[in-house]
Amino acid sequence: MLLTLLKCKLHKATVTHSELEYEGSCAIDGDLLDAAGILPYEQIQIYNIANGERFTTYAIRAEAGSRVISVNGAAAHKANPGDRVIICAYGQLPREEAARFHPRLVYLDADNRIVRTGSDIPVQAA
């Protein structure tokens, strides 16, 4: 049996552009893609902290160092510049591998600079 797990995430990215007329997808700074391990054209889930929208699209590479997060095409209706979002990619692993797997977690500031990385989400206190 394969289990679907969080592969990686960009936590609290700031949307810099929202381009309705662009050909779909989400353009992400190439350095951020590399840090998270997200490949161009890989399916991603985007969770908009500002408005609660959750949607699926795919990643495309924006210029490295640009700090761009551009939500494009129809998805542009779901995010505006300045919105904070969580961008996740998932993978499937056999149960035995899943038990040992740790995701790549990349935490960003409001300017889409990496402030820290990790591989475990802390236990949530009651």
Swiss-Prot record:
A GO molecular function annotation here is:
aspartate 1-decarboxylase activity
Q: Which domain of life is it from?
A: Bacteria
Keyword Repeat appears in the UniProt entry: no
- According to its UniProt record, how is this protein modified after translation? Is synthesized initially as an inactive proenzyme, which is activated by self-cleavage at a specific serine bond to produce a beta-subunit with a hydroxyl group at its C-terminus and an alpha-subunit with a pyruvoyl group at its N-terminus.
List where in the cell it is found.
Cytoplasm
Q: Where is the signal peptide?
A: none
Q: Which residues carry this modification: Pyruvic acid (Ser)?
A: S25
Q: Identify which residues the record assigns to the active site.
A: S25 (schiff-base intermediate with substrate), Y58 (proton donor)
* Family matches, as Pfam families: Asp_decarbox
Q: Which GO terms describe its cellular component?
A: cytosol
Described purpose of this protein according to its UniProt entry: Catalyzes the pyruvoyl-dependent decarboxylation of aspartate to produce beta-alanine.
For this chain, the family text in UniProt reads: Belongs to the PanD family.
Q: What is this protein called?
A: Aspartate 1-decarboxylase
What gene is it encoded by? Answer: panD
